[in-house]
Amino acid sequence: MANLLVIHGPNLNLLGTREPKYYGSITLEAINSNLTHQAAQAGHHLTCFQANAEHILIEQIHSAAHQDIAFIIINPAAFTHTSIALRDALAAVAIPFIEVHLSNVHRREAFRRHSYFSDIAEGVISGLGPTGYELALQAVFARLLPP
């Protein structure tokens, strides 16, 4: 059994009502419930965390290093394009992570096309809606298998 962490960045608490054109109508609670169930079925423990403040997300990442977290799935949301501090926190704890985005950031405004995380992530999934989280979780399961 592995301990896994899903981190959701700013404004993702508004899923279900926020710009459904880009983010769909599913709620964050529904995404978290689905992921938690899938992880439990695979024999893993999954914790989901959301915050709108950068420093709170950083503190969560720092504490992951002391909680035996084997893998992180993160949707940094708007911090993708702005937060060197969040990137540095992920690099500092050296826990492998997959970057997820609900919308296809490459089909949106130009400023959304740059990520401070992609080059240090194990992988990036963008534009597949909530299915992107599920695919990231499946990739995590595959990486946790013994060689």
From Swiss-Prot:
The active site is at Y23, H101. Disulfide bonds: none annotated. Its EC number is 4.2.1.10. It is an enzyme of class 4 (lyase). SUPFAM superfamilies: Type II 3-dehydroquinate dehydratase. Substrate binds at N75, H81, D88, L102, S103, R112. GO terms for molecular function: 3-dehydroquinate dehydratase activity. The keyword Lyase applies. It catalyses: 3-dehydroquinate = 3-dehydroshikimate + H2O. One of its GO terms (biological process) is chorismate biosynthetic process. The record marks R18 as: Transition state stabilizer. It comes from the Bacteria. Pathway: Metabolic intermediate biosynthesis; chorismate biosynthesis; chorismate from D-erythrose 4-phosphate and phosphoenolpyruvate: step 3/7. Pfam families: DHquinase_II. Belongs to the type-II 3-dehydroquinase family. Homododecamer. Catalyzes a trans-dehydration via an enolate intermediate. PANTHER family: CATABOLIC 3-DEHYDROQUINASE. This is 3-dehydroquinate dehydratase. It comes from Nitrosococcus oceani (strain ATCC 19707 / BCRC 17464 / JCM 30415 / NCIMB 11848 / C-107). The lineage of its organism: Bacteria, Pseudomonadati, Pseudomonadota, Gammaproteobacteria, Chromatiales.
